[in-house]
Amino acid sequence: MTNTMNRIVSSNQIPEEYRACRPKFAQLVGRWFLRAFGWKVEGSVPAVSGNENIIIIAGPHTSNWDGVFGFAAILGLDAKITFFGKHSLFGQPVLGRFLTYMGGIPVDKSKPGIGLTEVAIDNMSKLNGSLLVISPEGTRAKTEKLKSGFLRINKAVEGKVFLAAFDFESNRIVLDSFLDLSGDNENDLAYVKEYFTKFKGKRPENY
């Protein structure tokens, strides 16, 4: 049996209903990449009753490297996720195919009346159980206040919010726990903002 203390990443860290069932090779690529850079995934997403929608908020988001290690972890976990990105990225031949393969959905924010929150709610309401990964900061640049979109999405789809973090000081991605929402958006956002201060981003000055 593999010693969990030495484990890099495993599909056992997420419930079976949220697994993508990708080829073993894809999972091995993710694990190899994390191992090559000395990274690992700690913690797990607990099993839930039924196919519930889970909004995973990940931070602190300070660099494009978050996405690099995040995708490697998703492959290693064999996680079936949904995320949203700029439509222009999906127009690039190789990158666009990769993002779509990983569960990405393009969003054209230049169109009137179209926002990430509305697109997320529309897409998640059609899914029978999904892991939506989102950055509550909404940008890699420094911001004083987190965006409340994930709270609005969660309320609309009657899901659960799960905390995850990037820690570049200890080279790990942390799958922590479900967030016990108070119902007061300002208090919940302040709690999440403070929570992420426990971890060191690639560019700490951006958080």
Residue ranges and their predicted role:
Residues 19, 39-198, 203-207:
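Soluble catalytic domains of membrane acyltransferases
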